Amino acid sequence: MPEGHVIHRLATGLTTRFGGEEVSVVSPQGRFATEASLLDGSVLTDAEAWGKHLFVHFTAGTVHIHLGLIGTLQFDPLAAPRGQVRLRIADDTVAADLRGPQRCALVTPVEEDAAVAKLGVDPLRVVGGGTPAGELNARKLETALAKTRRSSKPVGALLMDQALYAGVGSIYRTEVLFRLGIDPTRPGKSLTTAELDEIWSDMVDLMTYGEVAGRIDTVRPEHTPEAMGRPPRKDDHGGEVYVYRRAGLPCLVCGTPVETGEMAGRKIYWCPVCQRG
């Protein structure tokens, strides 16, 4: 499932390409045809992300998209649709095709607000700053940290709870905990205020980089392939990481074999030596 930085990049891409334009909105697959007909020819005003949820705003309504595990939203030169395209947003030269989403629905402003209300703080959205959205995110951050401090659940599970930390997925939670030397099985209530602040700060930094770069890189300069004289990582997820999907391989820092298990329904990876905190 794409993590939050991917959804934010898609929101930026939609706004940059189509923002302020009248666009064609169709459903080649047919499953969104009625809703698409209501939006066709209207102006796409902007798109925004909250966690792993994408909201595309038109003058005629809003589309709420969640890609789920297999969904994709791809920008290509305008051509005949390929495959099962649920939703196509296009101008005269470029089409954005949505395939296989978990959710694609036309929603009212009240329904959009209700969807956002269920989500936690988004590391890629402004916290505070005086705007309604920023102040909402600030309240969500306060709530997330408070609930984490009171919870007996493992921190590795809490970071995956989208009602607490929206947009954080398995890769980022795994890598942040490694970078800070924190055992993923530690109960949230055992974390100090300083540790929670470090988790939040590192999450913001890594996800912000991911949004800009379009890939997940979590290793520090001294652990890059060039610095260590090792081959670059080859993986569908791309990017250089410390422990994610490296079970049984030597830790890049201490050489101990990386361990793996399941937490919050997803694989998690850690170094038993580096993550004793």
Predicted regions: what is each one?
Residues 22-35, 48, 144-277:
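Basic, nucleic-acid-binding surfaces and adjacent catalytic neighborhoods in DNA/RNA-processing proteins
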Residues 8, 16-20, 32, 39, ...:
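Non-transmembrane, interaction-prone segments in cytosolic or luminal domains
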